[in-house]
């Protein structure tokens, strides 16, 4: 008996021994394998490129995920605003926010001009997005279960230097960037964005901050805000702050920051605060970001 005949007989015997249900399963697996083999040729669907930097400031390798606007390579004469996204790793906020940026940039939506999206991926989020806390720092009761996760906290100063001296120069050197630079962050990332706004405001001229974790270090950044705001330069700037229905601590802190910004901001700073009661800490990112885009880039009037 030829080999293929032997194999055929063996397969038939196997199906008979397995019984009806197992035989169907085996047959289904064979059919699935056959269908898989019959799939037409495909190619990867690529929305961005990942670039690895050896950071001298942080002494570690870091990743940037960068999505270019449609038509970037076809129009070498154009330069583009840059949106820097904190929590910008592939398994963080980059992928879904890339979709939001693409959607907002559509010509029939017009909430955002074509931009370069730069996702700043994390290695130790709680280290990089928190400043050094005072020895008198008292953890909020609702954070007691998470304190061990903050054992490396207090590294925001170095992380801000990384953004200023390595990330921004890298992007400006390798891509056709325009003058506008937006920083987007939520939760701890919004705490960092608030710190940059107050202490290094010239790094960006547009800030989107959602649900900032101002509880950190007994609200010390909130307490420093009046003086820091008074010392800010008068260069034109756009600032958007939002909070959802996230409990009294988060809401009250965000409202307090909004009141301080309104009172002490430089004249050329355009500021918008929104309370979004239908959103919570997990859902606020997309609606608030799209609202910020709409405030920063009003749709031109229809002709």
Describe the residue ranges of each PLM region.
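Bacterial N-terminal signal peptides
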Residues: 8-18
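Sec/Tat signal peptide C-region and signal peptidase I cleavage site
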Residues: 19-23
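Non-catalytic cap/lid and distal C-terminal segments of serine-dependent acyl enzymes
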Residues: 24-303
């Amino acid at each position: 008996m030829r080999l293929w005949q032997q194999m055929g007989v063996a397969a038939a015997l196997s199906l008979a021994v397995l019984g009806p249900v197992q035989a169907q399963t085996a047959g289904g697996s064979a059919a699935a394998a056959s269908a898989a083999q019959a799939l037409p040729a495909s190619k990867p669907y690529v929305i961005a490129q990942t670039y690895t930097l050896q950071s001298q400031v942080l002494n570690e390798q870091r990743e940037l995920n960068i999505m270019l606007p449609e038509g970037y390579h076809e129009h070498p004469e154009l330069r583009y605003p840059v949106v820097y996204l904190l929590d910008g790793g592939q398994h963080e906020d980059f992928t879904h926010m890339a979709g939001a940026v693409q959607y907002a940039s559509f010509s029939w939506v017009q909430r955002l001009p074509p931009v370069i999206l730069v996702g700043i991926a994390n290695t130790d989020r709680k280290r990089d997005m928190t400043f050094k806390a005072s020895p008198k720092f008292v953890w909020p009761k609702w954070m007691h279960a998470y304190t061990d996760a903050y054992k490396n906290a207090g590294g925001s100063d170095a992380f801000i230097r990384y953004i200023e001296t390595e990330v921004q120069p890298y992007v400006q050197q390798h891509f056709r960037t325009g003058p506008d630079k937006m920083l987007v962050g939520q939760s701890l990332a919004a705490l960092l964005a608030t710190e940059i706004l107050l202490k290094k405001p010239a790094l960006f001229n547009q800030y989107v901050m959602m649900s900032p974790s101002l509880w950190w270090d007994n609200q010390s950044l909130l307490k420093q805000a009046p003086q820091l705001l008074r010392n800010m330069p008068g260069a034109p700037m756009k600032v958007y702050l939002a909070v959802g229905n996230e409990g009294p601590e988060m809401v009250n802190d965000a409202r307090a920051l909004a009141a301080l910004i309104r009172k002490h901001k430089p004249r050329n700073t355009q500021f918008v605060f929104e309370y979004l009661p239908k959103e919570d800490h997990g859902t606020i990112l997309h609606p608030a970001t799209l609202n910020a885009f709409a405030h920063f880039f009003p749709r031109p009037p229809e002709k």
